[in-house]
């Protein structure tokens, strides 16, 4: 992806690896080839096709140029964040005795279910994929216990857990602006925020379902959507036809502006049922904004008591919003920040480097 949680995680991990004295090289798919030195290390882009219907996702589909690049780079560690098109890299690394780690950024059966594959068939397909991955890679890194379950199910012994993190300096409660909140709320009493890719597996329609349910119950609520994707046209059309007060901002590339939005909102919605961590929800918590998250995902494990886990319906998400709004505002915002402070990037980088059995970074502390 060109944006979103995975891109954020790769950038933050790269900066952490660099600060710990390593020489990280990130290889990503893109439209054209490039090779840049950045604050997260060296970033090499290889041309990769766009997956139809995903609204911009690209993959490293051509093995020959990537294999040649890996041979030229001669890495002493390999970390892979694509469990589909790059599965072959585990065997490549084994043959060369290079310790390789695969990071499970999503559950295979969870993604298959969101695409409509029946539960048992999804589990069987996921088990086949995961057995091969567990054999091919020295370690499998899962960011939550929830993500780890599908590997526990097959008896994998090389699974370690390493949570992701959040930028506690950029994402902070002090960014909350009553002026911005009033402008985005457009006269409503409650401002909801959805920061998500607008694609099938993220279930963004649940946010509109919740908004409609809350308004039917007499609450003056509006919704801001920060994100883009293939479902955007249908969501915009629905909001217009049902006269729902929704602002579609599209992709917000300015991370500072996004943090301002996350701090201004009263509640953040995270309806994706296959999320293995949910960085945008964690960023909202760091800004002091509580979260209603899908009970089917890993997010209840991340948000804890600072949020509400809801079944995957608009009515249940609306109930979760009401539950959070019933808590005193100072208490719910303080609880959100306190929860986020358990997930700083320094701890994340330390855990990932430990999975690689590599040199660890020096201590750091996040700001408020």
Which ranges hold each PLM region?
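A charged, aromatic-enriched C-terminal amphipathic alpha-helix characteristic of glycosyltransferases
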Residues: 178, 330-357
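Donor nucleotide-sugar binding/catalytic pocket of nucleotide-sugar-dependent glycosyltransferases
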Residues: 28, 44-47, 123, 127-176
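Conserved acidic donor-binding segment of nucleotide-sugar-dependent glycosyltransferases
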Residues: 305-315, 323-329
